[in-house]
Amino acid sequence: MVTKRSLLKLYLLGIVTLGIYFIYWLVMVKRELNSLGANIPTCWLLIIPIANIYWLYKFAEGFVKVLKPGESAVLYFLLFWLVSIIMPAIVQSELNKLAERGG
Protein backbone atom coordinates (compact mmCIF):
# COMPACT_ATOMS: atom_id res chain seq x y z
CA MET A 1 0.00 0.00 0.00
CA VAL A 2 1.39 3.36 -1.03
CA THR A 3 0.76 6.38 1.18
CA LYS A 4 0.15 9.79 -0.34
CA ARG A 5 2.27 12.40 1.45
CA SER A 6 2.44 16.18 1.15
CA LEU A 7 5.71 17.47 -0.32
CA LEU A 8 5.47 20.65 1.74
CA LYS A 9 5.03 18.65 4.94
CA LEU A 10 7.91 16.38 3.94
CA TYR A 11 10.34 19.28 3.49
CA LEU A 12 9.11 21.26 6.51
CA LEU A 13 9.44 18.28 8.84
CA GLY A 14 12.84 17.51 7.33
CA ILE A 15 14.05 21.03 8.11
CA VAL A 16 12.47 21.26 11.57
CA THR A 17 13.90 17.89 12.66
CA LEU A 18 17.31 18.67 11.14
CA GLY A 19 17.08 15.80 8.68
CA ILE A 20 15.84 13.06 10.99
CA TYR A 21 12.44 13.01 9.29
CA PHE A 22 14.17 12.46 5.92
CA ILE A 23 15.74 9.27 7.31
CA TYR A 24 12.34 8.13 8.61
CA TRP A 25 10.82 8.96 5.22
CA LEU A 26 13.51 6.91 3.43
CA VAL A 27 12.71 3.91 5.63
CA MET A 28 8.98 4.19 4.91
CA VAL A 29 9.48 4.66 1.17
CA LYS A 30 11.91 1.73 1.05
CA ARG A 31 9.22 -0.48 2.61
CA GLU A 32 6.64 0.72 0.11
CA LEU A 33 8.94 0.18 -2.88
CA ASN A 34 9.92 -3.28 -1.62
CA SER A 35 6.24 -4.20 -1.24
CA LEU A 36 5.79 -3.21 -4.90
CA GLY A 37 8.62 -5.48 -6.07
CA ALA A 38 11.86 -3.56 -5.54
CA ASN A 39 14.85 -5.19 -3.84
CA ILE A 40 16.29 -2.43 -1.65
CA PRO A 41 18.49 -3.62 1.25
CA THR A 42 18.15 -2.63 4.90
CA CYS A 43 18.26 1.06 5.78
CA TRP A 44 20.99 0.44 8.33
CA LEU A 45 23.40 0.84 5.42
CA LEU A 46 22.51 4.54 5.38
CA ILE A 47 24.66 5.20 8.45
CA ILE A 48 27.73 3.30 7.25
CA PRO A 49 30.16 5.35 5.15
CA ILE A 50 30.67 3.99 1.60
CA ALA A 51 27.84 1.48 2.16
CA ASN A 52 25.40 4.38 2.00
CA ILE A 53 26.47 5.01 -1.61
CA TYR A 54 25.70 1.37 -2.43
CA TRP A 55 22.35 1.70 -0.64
CA LEU A 56 21.46 4.84 -2.60
CA TYR A 57 22.25 3.03 -5.86
CA LYS A 58 20.02 0.12 -4.85
CA PHE A 59 17.30 2.62 -3.86
CA ALA A 60 17.54 4.29 -7.28
CA GLU A 61 17.48 0.86 -8.93
CA GLY A 62 14.33 -0.10 -6.99
CA PHE A 63 12.71 3.26 -7.75
CA VAL A 64 13.30 2.78 -11.47
CA LYS A 65 12.16 -0.85 -11.42
CA VAL A 66 8.85 -0.02 -9.72
CA LEU A 67 7.99 3.51 -10.84
CA LYS A 68 10.04 4.32 -13.95
CA PRO A 69 10.50 1.08 -15.92
CA GLY A 70 12.73 1.45 -18.94
CA GLU A 71 14.68 4.40 -17.54
CA SER A 72 18.29 4.38 -16.33
CA ALA A 73 18.94 3.53 -12.68
CA VAL A 74 22.41 5.07 -13.01
CA LEU A 75 20.91 8.38 -14.12
CA TYR A 76 18.59 8.50 -11.09
CA PHE A 77 21.43 7.41 -8.78
CA LEU A 78 23.60 10.29 -10.01
CA LEU A 79 20.69 12.71 -9.75
CA PHE A 80 19.84 11.55 -6.21
CA TRP A 81 23.50 11.63 -5.13
CA LEU A 82 24.58 14.91 -6.70
CA VAL A 83 21.37 16.91 -6.22
CA SER A 84 19.99 15.10 -3.20
CA ILE A 85 17.70 17.91 -2.06
CA ILE A 86 15.32 17.18 -4.96
CA MET A 87 15.32 13.40 -4.46
CA PRO A 88 12.40 13.35 -1.98
CA ALA A 89 10.31 15.51 -4.31
CA ILE A 90 10.90 13.23 -7.31
CA VAL A 91 10.26 10.00 -5.41
CA GLN A 92 7.25 11.22 -3.44
CA SER A 93 5.67 12.78 -6.53
CA GLU A 94 5.82 9.44 -8.31
CA LEU A 95 4.48 7.62 -5.25
CA ASN A 96 1.64 10.14 -4.95
CA LYS A 97 0.70 9.50 -8.60
CA LEU A 98 0.65 5.77 -7.88
CA ALA A 99 -1.45 6.29 -4.73
CA GLU A 100 -3.99 8.36 -6.68
CA ARG A 101 -4.32 5.54 -9.22
CA GLY A 102 -5.01 3.16 -6.35
CA GLY A 103 -1.67 1.34 -6.34
UniProtKB/Swiss-Prot annotation:
Its main location: membrane. The keyword Amino-acid biosynthesis does not apply. It is a multi-pass membrane protein. The keyword Heme does not apply. Coiled coil: none annotated. Keywords: Cell membrane, Membrane, Transmembrane, Transmembrane helix. It is found in: Cell membrane. GO terms for cellular component: plasma membrane. The chain crosses the membrane at residues 10-28, 35-57, 72-91. This is Uncharacterized protein AF_1598. It comes from Archaeoglobus fulgidus (strain ATCC 49558 / DSM 4304 / JCM 9628 / NBRC 100126 / VC-16).
